[in-house]
Regions:
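Hydrophobic recognition helices of helix-based DNA-binding modules
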Residues: 46, 50, 54, 58, ...
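Short coil/turn segments at alpha/beta junctions that flank glycine-rich nucleotide-binding fingerprints
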Residues: 10-14, 89, 132
Length: 188
């Protein structure tokens, strides 16, 4: 699986070579095609496996966990924990690289489903923050939810694309600055 994820992540979906993947896995083509019938099926399989690995490493808390006067400190701790786990677990980077590939729509079902769930969770956390007075209410809630999700995606995609350019401490500093940007955008 890691071989395929590395191939997709480095070459992109269109240029990823099944022959290279099969060769690096020391499989015969007939064995590979007995298990999976196409590049699209392999891509979906790898995505599903990486999503499961990442999900097993994250404690997704109920949005109500953030309610109250400690909203921002709770969100900051949660964000810091996500960053820490993502730097420790290589599967996060592999998944991130595959998430942002240009791939045909039919093979992006797992990405769309996962992003939809994350988008809804972020919206619910935002709603909790608005209710407890920690998040500004001068923008319509749906617009604000789209804005914060777009910012998070830009941060994620950019960080993944430039991951190798940073030391571990520089990545940590970047994460702190990214969180501060979100807080400045949302706090009253």
């Amino acid at each position: 699986m890691e071989t395929a994820a590395l191939e997709f992540g480095s070459a992109g979906y269109e240029h990823a070579s099944l022959n290279r993947i099969i060769e690096q896995c020391a499989m015969s083509k007939s064995s590979f095609y007995y298990i999976l019938s196409s590049k699209a099926e392999l891509y979906e399989f790898v995505l599903q496996e990486l999503i499961a690995e990442v999900a097993a490493e994250i404690d997704v808390v109920a949005p109500e966990h953030f309610a109250g006067t400690e909203f921002w400190s709770k969100v900051e701790r949660y964000f810091a924990n996500l960053i820490s786990v993502s730097q420790r677990e290589h599967s996060f980077l592999l998944l991130g690289r595959m998430f942002y590939l240009q791939a045909p729509d039919p093979v992006k079902t797992a990405v769309a489903t996962t992003l939809g769930a994350v988008r809804e969770w972020v919206h619910e956390v935002l709603r909790v923050g608005r209710r407890c007075g920690a998040v500004r209410t001068d923008l319509p809630e749906p617009l604000q939810a789209e804005l914060v999700f777009a910012i998070l995606q830009v941060f994620d995609e950019w960080t993944i694309a430039h991951y190798a350019d940073f030391s571990a401490s520089a990545l940590q500093n970047l994460a702190v600055a990214q969180f501060a940007t979100i807080r400045r955008t949302l706090a009253p």
